[in-house]
From Swiss-Prot:
One of its GO terms (biological process) is neuroblast proliferation. It comes from Homo sapiens (Human). It holds the Pfam family AMP-binding. The gene is ACSL6. GO terms for molecular function: arachidonate-CoA ligase activity; ATP binding; enzyme binding; long-chain fatty acid-CoA ligase activity; protein homodimerization activity. GO terms for cellular component: endoplasmic reticulum; endoplasmic reticulum membrane; membrane; mitochondrial outer membrane; peroxisomal membrane; plasma membrane. The lineage of its organism: Eukaryota, Metazoa, Chordata, Craniata, Vertebrata. This is Long-chain-fatty-acid--CoA ligase 6.
């Protein structure tokens, strides 16, 4: 068909008549056409583009041959597990030196005083101070070897990192201590790890350590170094029990005068011993090598390399405890690329103020903080209209997220979400959440509202931090991503809970270069965690989803994490509460998506009436079980016993339901040996538990 015929059919002018056609149009029409063309051109060049995932999101992991059903990431260059990302960064010492080299001696560690801007230590300043401190430690009877354990008992601050780097510079091993361990656990750690030197931030912590020495509980402790100023009386008190008290500055000055050449570690050398708080018995010291930590964050780098790779201008806000590996691994990623880490002032209530001053680009969080953000946003939508508009805007942005578009410049951002983004400093491009499962509802909303990439990981200290991670581009919720390229994951049968690997369910086991070497001086518990083939048994129950991602569905042992990441052993708590006079039976319930515990209490029919009468409350057993004042009194008595027994606040129940009928074998809530059947109790009291959480929020 000829061109003229086509144009005639379409009723368009022939090419020779185009000039006459445009001359026939009015000036207003021509301007309008030009404006429309400009708008279309602008939209075409600036339209939001979907993020390109690094793999097929319908197949994010694949089965490993001859491995008993283990799966691996499809991201990577071959079947070999990833041990490192950079050849010049195979130890934590080399990681920091790489950052020093590529940063051009840029800013490294930031801190601020109230209502002041951030002040920065450069990479070279940090490296110099680390060498001075390490040399000073050598002058105080420490040795440059992996048998030398140095305790660090401090809140997040630049000095923490300087101490850590000082240890790595001279092949020493870091042993973090933290408040929630409790005095007994700290005493146990100092003795088990043969710690002679502890570096603390505040004089109060030095006093706590001295009290142990004075009671002859930690005879090996000989040197306490303080970051903050202290009174001369503290030094004198230390002298009386044979402990030298020094300021960190004095030790650095000593090291500067007696500088020693670095003694760098090897990848297989021990870098850190992380003692988990434990729920029964003494804490366990997970031994992690330099290679473990490097392998773990290298897996993260491999997964994200094509999408959101770390940069020198990245800034991380540090407020999650440095004693936990999740924070340590994320920070290592930043140092490796010459980025900056700014520390919060130490008060979580001022975190938003710190973020506005710092303007971080990377924001590691725990689900509890995400829940708070979500609740605060919706609490401000205090009318039905505001809430409807907020939900409408979120749905529009969630539709974009589902199509792979992540942005913060849409009309919905301008109208609704920019203030939320500004409260985080306005520059966040990546949020990483871990330590406990995140609510799919909260995660889905915040991915839309915050206009940045939000990743979720799963793991534990024993596999350094993470073993699974969200694949970029997969913004679905309700799972913890695919295996990292540094480890394999397999599920094994849990017969007693009716989970079978052949059905894609079972206990999660991890094997790879990020898996720890065992528990310090604890071969029995090491054998429980690590089998003869090197598989770490996590105790969590997982399920493979069709896309090759992992979903956490249960816990093998009755130990779980709350939303803030704290481990809780309900049976230990129940054994304390059962000592309350009116309590005959109790079931303590926790949820990884909630921040506190609740309980189901069955009162003792013989004790309850007289116990209530002493408190001025009378009635039949049935009446007493519905009495709100009596329920309050029982809860107060339980909490009292909990405090006397040393329970932490997160181990105390915040609300209870009184149930009048006893748990029994007949009603299916007890085993024949009269042990609680926890899954059945959870299901039986599902409605009451939901009500307790809704009332207590």
């Amino acid at each position: 068909m000829q061109t003229q015929e086509i144009l005639r059919i379409l009723r368009l002018p022939e090419l020779g008549d185009l000039g006459q056609f445009f001359r026939s149009l009015s000036a207003t029409t021509l301007v309008s056409m030009g404006a429309l063309a400009a708008i279309l051109a602008y939209w075409f060049t600036h339209r939001p583009k979907a993020l390109q995932p690094p793999c097929n999101l319908l197949m994010q992991s694949e089965e490993v041959e001859d491995s008993g059903g283990a799966r691996r990431s499809v991201i990577g260059s071959g079947p070999q597990l990833l041990t490192h990302y950079y050849d010049d960064a195979r130890t934590m010492y080399q990681v920091f030196r790489r950052g020093l080299s590529i940063s051009g001696n840029g800013p490294c560690l930031g801190f601020r005083k109230p209502k002041q801007p951030y002040q920065w230590l450069s990479y070279q300043e940090v490296a110099d101070r680390a060498e001075f401190l390490g040399s000073g430690l050598l002058q105080h009877n420490c040795k440059a070897c992996t048998d030398q354990f140095i305790g660090v008992f401090a809140q997040n601050r630049p000095e923490w990192i300087i101490v850590e780097l000082a240890c790595y510079t001279y092949s020493m091993v870091v042993v973090p201590l933290y408040d929630t361990l409790g005095p007994g656990a700290i005493r146990y750690i100092i003795n088990t790890a043969d710690i002679s030197t502890v570096i603390v931030d505040k004089p109060q912590k030095a006093v706590l350590l001295l009290e142990h020495v004075e009671r002859k509980e930690t005879p090996g402790l000989k040197l306490i170094i303080l970051m903050d100023p202290f009174e001369e009386a503290l030094k004198e008190r230390g002298q009386k029990c044979g402990v030298v008290i020094k300021s960190m500055q004095a030790v650095e000055d000593c090291g500067q005068e007696n500088h020693q050449a670095p003694v760098p570690p090897q990848p297989d050398d021990l870098s850190i011993v992380c003692f988990t708080s434990g729920t029964t018995g003494n804490p366990k010291g997970a031994m992690l090598t330099h290679g473990n930590v490097v392998a773990d964050f290298s897996g993260f780098l491999k997964v994200t390399e094509k999408v959101i790779f770390p940069r020198q201008d990245d800034v991380l806000i540090s407020f999650l405890p440095l004693a936990h590996m999740f924070e340590r691994v994320i920070q290592s990623v930043v140092y490796c690329h010459g980025g900056r880490v700014g520390f919060f002032q130490g008060d979580i209530r001022l975190l938003s103020d710190d973020m506005k001053a710092l303007c971080p680009t990377i924001f590691p969080v725990v689900p509890r903080l995400l829940n708070r953000m979500y609740d605060k946003i919706f609490s401000q939508a205090n009318t039905p209209l505001k809430r409807w508009l907020l939900e409408f805007a979120a749905k529009r942005k969630q539709a974009e997220v589902r199509s792979g578009i992540i942005r913060n410049d849409s009309i919905w951002d301008e109208l609704f979400f920019n203030k939320i983004q500004a409260s985080l400093g306005g520059c966040v491009r990546m949020i990483v959440t871990g330590a406990a499962p995140a609510s799919p509802t909260v995660l889905g909303f915040l991915r839309a509202a915050l206009g940045c990439q939000v990743y979720e990981g799963y793991g534990q200290t024993e596999c350094t931090a993470g073993c699974t991670f969200t694949t970029p581009g997969d913004w679905t919720s309700g799972h913890v991503g695919a295996p990292l390229p540094c480890n394999h994951i397999k599920l094994v049968d849990v017969e007693e809970l009716n989970y079978w690997a052949c059905k894609g369910e079972g206990e999660i086991c991890v094997r790879g270069p990020n898996v720890f070497k065992g528990y310090l001086k604890d071969p029995d518990r090491t054998k429980e965690a690590l089998d003869s083939d090197g598989w770490l048994h996590t105790g969590d129950i997982g399920k493979w989803l069709p896309a090759g991602t992992l979903k956490i569905i249960d816990r093998k042992k009755h130990i779980f994490k709350l939303a803030q990441g704290e481990y809780v052993a309900p049976e230990k708590i129940e054994n304390i509460y059962i000592r309350s006079q009116p309590v005959a039976q109790i079931y303590v319930h926790g949820d990884s998506l909630k921040a506190f515990l609740v309980g189901i209490v069955v009162p003792d029919p013989e004790v309850m009436p007289s116990w209530a009468q002493k408190r001025g409350i009378e009635g039949t057993y049935a009446d007493l079980c519905t009495n709100k004042d009596l329920k309050k009194a029982i809860l107060e008595d339980m909490v009292r016993l909990g405090k006397e027994s040393g329970l932490h606040s997160f181990e105390q129940v915040k609300a209870i339901h009184i149930h009048s009928d006893m748990f029994s074998v007949q009603n299916g809530l007890l085993t024949p040996t009269l042990k609680a059947k926890r899954p059945e109790l959870r299901e039986y009291f599902k409605k009451q538990i939901e009500e307790l959480y809704s009332i207590s929020m």
